[in-house]
Amino acid sequence: MFGKGGLGNLMKQAQQMQEKMQQMQEEIAKLEVTGESGAGLVKVTINGAHNCRRVEIDPSLLEDDKEMLEDLVAAAFNDAARRIEETQKEKMASVSSGMQLPPGFKMPF
């Protein structure tokens, strides 16, 4: 199944991959992205751990319907969560690129 030194090389690659993934996860946790709704009237900023860091609401919305404002805040948060997920996938894909994995081997482990 594995050629001469193949298993050893695979284990070495797996260890390197694990180190890179841990480093990438630390970087991702520090990332901040901003989601928007209502054409930018509501903005929610979250970090890579999905913790809300900031909520910005245009003053014009404070006079409007409370339910609409709540919906806009939820939509902005969901937009931010979607953006951080996309960023995480892109960064993690870059970690595994270049590895010579056996067919059918899925990452992360």
From Swiss-Prot:
Stretches for region Disordered: 89-109
InterPro entries named among the record's database cross-references: YbaB-like_sf, YbaB/EbfC
A GO CC term attached to the entry: cytosol
Keywords: Cytoplasm, DNA-binding
Gene Ontology terms for molecular function: DNA binding
Alphabetized NCBIfam families for the sequence: DNA_YbaB_EbfC (TIGR00103)
Chain's role: Binds to DNA and alters its conformation. May be involved in regulation of gene expression, nucleoid organization and DNA protection.
Quaternary assembly: Homodimer.
Protein's recorded name: Nucleoid-associated protein CKO_02678
